[in-house]
Amino acid sequence: MARYIGPKAKLSRREGTDLFLKSARRSLADKCKLDSKPGQHGRTSGARTSDYGTQLREKQKVKRIYGVLERQFRRYFAEADRRKGNTGENLLQLLESRLDNVVYRMGFGSTRAEARQLVSHKSITVNGVVANVPSQQVKAGDVIAIREKAKKQARIIEALSLAEQGGMPSWVAVDAKKFEGTFKQMPERADIAGDINESLIVELYSR
């Protein structure tokens, strides 16, 4: 399955909620009708969505939020299921501790896609070592930084400025002047923002 490169607003409309694929700080709610499906007049249907359909829709939504494809998502779920504790929460923690997501949460990228690009273009270091794998798992205490050559990029400066205004997650500590941040700890479920019902995904894979 190829990565989707079409209009981001269409994906949010399909899920009926803002997935913040265009910006973490600017909602699409004022720009388009999120409760209307994509299409010239919005697709309508009188049929009730089945439990399976609802569960599948939730999985698709989470995949789109984090920019993860099906095979990789299945691996994340398998790992989450192997770990102790709540499988759904474990899944979200694995997704949140991806390097591209941490770069995004620290405000270095305005979207996860932009953060993923920064990692792929070798603009990021982890504990002083250049990293270029977006799916790399970040551990507590790891220091994420922007490489010197990338610190003057306008998009990074703007994204960081907006992130500072909106506030950072409690599980990261960012020094904007140094363009670096520390992954303090794995986020708790209450710390993970977003309209996500992970229990539906667990139910889907438990069928």
Swiss-Prot record:
InterPro entries: Ribosomal_uS4, Ribosomal_uS4_bac-type, Ribosomal_uS4_CS, Ribosomal_uS4_N, S4_RNA-bd, S4_RNA-bd_sf. One of its GO terms (biological process) is ribosomal small subunit biogenesis. Residues 31-55 are annotated as: Disordered. Residues 42-53 have a biased composition (Polar residues). PROSITE patterns: RIBOSOMAL_S4 (PS00632), S4 (PS50889). Residues 97-160 form the S4 RNA-binding domain. The keyword rRNA processing does not apply. Transmembrane segments: none annotated. GO terms for cellular component: small ribosomal subunit. The keyword Ribosomal protein applies. Keywords: Ribonucleoprotein, Ribosomal protein, RNA-binding, rRNA-binding. GO terms for molecular function: rRNA binding; structural constituent of ribosome. One of the primary rRNA binding proteins, it binds directly to 16S rRNA where it nucleates assembly of the body of the 30S subunit. Part of the 30S ribosomal subunit. Contacts protein S5. The interaction surface between S4 and S5 is involved in control of translational fidelity. Belongs to the universal ribosomal protein uS4 family. This is Small ribosomal subunit protein uS4. It comes from Burkholderia vietnamiensis (strain G4 / LMG 22486).
